[in-house]
Amino acid sequence: MSDLTTRTAAELAQQIHAREISSVEVTQAHLDRIAEVDGELNAFLHVAGERALEAAAAVDAALAAGEAPASPLAGVPLALKDVFTTTDMPTTCASKILEGWMSPYDATVTTKLRAAGIPILGKTNMDEFAMGSSTENSAYGPTRNPWDTTRIPGGSGGGSAAALASRQAPLAIGTDTGGSIRQPAAVTATVGTKPTYGTVSRYGLVACASSLDQGGPCGRTVLDTALLHEVIAGYDPRDSTSRDVPVPPVVEAARRGAAGDLRGVKVGVVKELHSDSYQPGVLASFDAAVAVLKDLGAEVVEVSCPHFEYGLPSYYLVMPSEVSSNLARFDAMRYGLRVGDDGTHSAEQVMAMTRAAGFGPEVKRRIMIGTYALSAGYYDEYYGQALKVRTLIARDFDRAYEQVDVLVSPTSPFTPWKLGEKVDDPLAMYLSDLCTLPTNLAGHPAMSVPSGLSKDDGMPVGLQIMAPALADDRLYRVGAAYEAARGPIA
């Protein structure tokens, strides 16, 4: 393994911009690493080596001509979750229904990455249409956890997290609907942030649940993640949910936090996200992390968010309802797979045959749940009630932030389980979102930072840090301070 793949993105950027190393060298080193290990891990669905090297060469040429770097991360390659559209690579969402589909336009996030001079190594594996917590729901096979290849890497963005953890990429982009950036980060000992809803454009992000989906940055350090956050965030008039507000100073906050002083910061431990039903090693790691925050000068208090108890059932009504609506567009008429189009079937039959063949079991399950929840006789009883709970959860957050600056919890109640262990028990798998989904329901930012290895099985555990809307910088200050005090993960 080239030592170029072990350096942080910040280190690589500094050395590329100083012309001590070239972007082509760095990109090639990561492509070599992909060729070496991804046959076993299956983190990538598509590798764009030639295009990535062309982008890297363009960065090197610009620097050689005396031009300033296009961004603080210019020349540092990246892995992109296969849910963002790209004109030069297939966008499949890990589904057979979009196998080989080429988008006619780039997502705004893709456009920002290209403008920043960031070579895109390829598109990463995921649960189909971002529905799942293990990356086992991909139509192209599961991704394996680099820490133990018999275990899951989290989901839905397990491909991006596994690529980071295995040194196949120094940076990655994910999406988070109910924890799909943070839970994979936790179980692979990487860093992932779900920004405030509406601060990273969803234009060109294939929708799962539109009121919950949020693209976000992933890295191996808090500073790397902050640098990428500033590249992809910002107002986009093409996204009707985009917020026209300044990007929080997350890089400055990360650098400040690394100094290790949290005096004056109030941290709330959420009572409802600390349960004896959680894995003992997860709780032990979390309690140790809270002790570190106290040692850094933070004031730690317990806070109660009583309606979090209803977060899981509320989420699993809101999200499938939006899925049912969004995925209606895959009708075999406009793009993607088309089955039975031989002139002997009606349009309705072609649509039914295509959806039956093209969608996997979990996607079908959520479409059915959502369609039922939205049906005329049950709308108020199910979907309407879930929206009321969503409002109550947001109010719980508001009351909590009157007392504290940030909230903390374990990222996931469990360490990564064995591949196949929960495939036939979706309810058990849904529980892995227990700690992460409240922030999606409220639209608030949250981050997962590695907090060590579980005493139960030696697998990675994550500390979740949450903040009020548009206070993403608080995540980075606290996360960087904790990261510096915690030291390396074994």
Curated annotation (Swiss-Prot):
Q: Which UniProt keywords apply?
A: ATP-binding, Ligase, Nucleotide-binding, Protein biosynthesis
Name the EC number(s): 6.3.5.7
Q: GO CC annotations?
A: glutamyl-tRNA(Gln) amidotransferase complex
- Keyword Transferase part of the UniProt annotation: no
| Biological processes, Gene Ontology terms | translation
Detail the disulphide connectivity of this chain as listed in its UniProt entry. none
Q: Which InterPro entries match?
A: Amidase, Amidase_CS, Amidase_dom, AS_sf, GatA
Q: Where are the catalytic residues?
A: 81 (charge relay system), 156 (charge relay system), 180 (acyl-ester intermediate)
Query: A single Gene Ontology molecular function, please?
Result: glutaminyl-tRNA synthase (glutamine-hydrolyzing) activity
Q: Which reaction does it catalyse?
A: L-glutamyl-tRNA(Gln) + L-glutamine + ATP + H2O = L-glutaminyl-tRNA(Gln) + L-glutamate + ADP + phosphate + H(+)
Q: Which domain of life is it from?
A: Bacteria
What is the similarity comment for this entry?
Belongs to the amidase family. GatA subfamily.
PANTHER family referenced in this protein's UniProt entry, alphabetically: GLUTAMYL-TRNA(GLN) AMIDOTRANSFERASE SUBUNIT A, TRANSAMIDASE
Quote the function comment for this protein: Allows the formation of correctly charged Gln-tRNA(Gln) through the transamidation of misacylated Glu-tRNA(Gln) in organisms which lack glutaminyl-tRNA synthetase. The reaction takes place in the presence of glutamine and ATP through an activated gamma-phospho-Glu-tRNA(Gln).
The protein's assembly and partners: Heterotrimer of A, B and C subunits.
Query: What protein name applies here?
Result: Glutamyl-tRNA(Gln) amidotransferase subunit A
